[in-house]
Design a protein with these regions (language model features):
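Phosphate/diphosphate ligand-binding glycine-rich loop within oxidoreductases
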Residues: 27-142
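Glycine-rich adenosine-cofactor-binding loop
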Residues: 38, 129, 148-169
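Short helix-loop-beta connector
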Residues: 144-149, 250
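Conserved S-adenosyl-L-methionine
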Residues: 169-174, 273-275
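NAD(P)-binding Rossmann-fold cofactor-contacting core
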Residues: 172-198
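Rossmann-like adenosine-cofactor binding region
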Residues: 201-277
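Adenosine-phosphate binding glycine-rich loop
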Residues: 252-253, 257-312
Length: 312
């Protein structure tokens, strides 16, 4: 009927008005800009995640993704100051490239020489690395503390290095790192020395991942087994660094940084053996939450809401 159609039109106009009002509230002459620096970035869910949080907490901020060429990284970092941005996240392949342009680095970022979050503190650019914090925060959300624990870590690339330094800083008793003995081995040895300097009480050891006997012994000895390499994600979703599931035991905690698939072969087999497991999606969300806490000076990201909105 005409009355019914008019009611629908009125509702649409009202909704459009609310949307326009919401847009005016989000963007103004005082809106503070934040962003993502990397390449490629079109696939990133960071803008949706952070802008959701800004709306939720009525923050006059906006977050955009910037696809930056390698020769534009320095200019992009300088723009954070020039445009009075609150900060920026940094993704591949520029986590190490931005380091020389920071005014200050946190201990974790300094140790591994990699930055994934830049915070503009009144014109001083502070480089953080929240990957390691995301890992330990995800464990904490699952009732697990790393202090005093013996940890076996498989993979010591960018994410693995972040995890290694963070668990050492948070008081892990022992950390056994396994990595392929490839061209990156010398740089891993340097990282181990850097970690020892900032966390001398953590007993560190480095092993070739090809040494299955050493890996078996480490898994038998440790409290937490963490996978931090690409094994488990496509096209290796049917693979695991632990070839023999009999190595698992019910009192072992098994974690994986891979978040797609949400449950890797490693985690499936560990869970079947009675282990407590933690997947990579929680770490991904927690490292973003740590960055939001830094940007917002202490606000807590609604992690469960973000997961339901973007990943479920």
């Amino acid at each position: 009927t005409a009355a019914f159609n008019q009611t629908i039109r009125n509702k649409k106009f009202a909704a459009a008005g609310r949307q326009e009002e919401e847009t005016r509230m989000q963007l103004s002459g005082t809106t503070t800009l934040l962003g993502l620096i990397g390449s490629p970035v079109a696939h990133s869910k960071s803008p949706a995640m952070y802008n959701y949080c800004f709306r939720k907490f009525n923050m006059d901020c906006a977050y955009l993704a910037f696809d930056v060429a390698a020769d534009q990284v320095e200019q992009s970092v300088k723009a954070i100051k020039t445009l009075h941005m609150r900060g920026a996240n940094v993704t591949m392949p520029f986590k190490t490239t931005v380091v020389p342009y920071m005014d200050r680095l946190t201990p974790a970022a300094e140790t591994i020489q990699a930055v994934n979050t830049i915070v503009n503190e009144d014109g001083v650019l502070v480089g953080h690395n929240t990957d390691g914090c995301g890992y330990t925060q995800n464990l904490r959300r699952n009732g697990i503390e790393v202090a005093g624990k013996k940890i076996t870590l498989i993979g010591c690339g960018g994410v693995g290095s972040s995890i290694a330094v963070q668990v050492a800083l948070e008081g892990a008793a022992e950390l056994a790192i396994f990595n392929l003995k490839d061209k990156f081995w010398p740089s891993i040895e340097e990282r181990m020395e850097a970690i020892h300097k900032v966390a001398p009480n953590c007993v560190l050891s480095l092993h070739d991942l090809a040494d299955q006997d050493a890996l078996h012994a480490a898994v038998d000895h440790c409290d937490i087994l963490s996978n931090a390499n690409m094994v488990g994600m496509p096209p290796m979703e049917n693979m695991s660094n632990i070839k023999d599931p009999s190595w698992f035991r019910p009192d072992l905690i098994v974690t994986d940084v891979v978040y797609s698939p949400t449950e890797t072969k490693l985690l499936r087999e560990a869970k079947a053996a009675g282990c407590k497991t933690c997947g990579g999606l929680g770490m991904l969300l927690c490292q973003g939450a740590e960055a939001f806490r830094l940007y917002s000076k202490g606000l807590e990201m609604p992690i469960d809401e973000i997961q339901a909105l973007l990943y479920d």
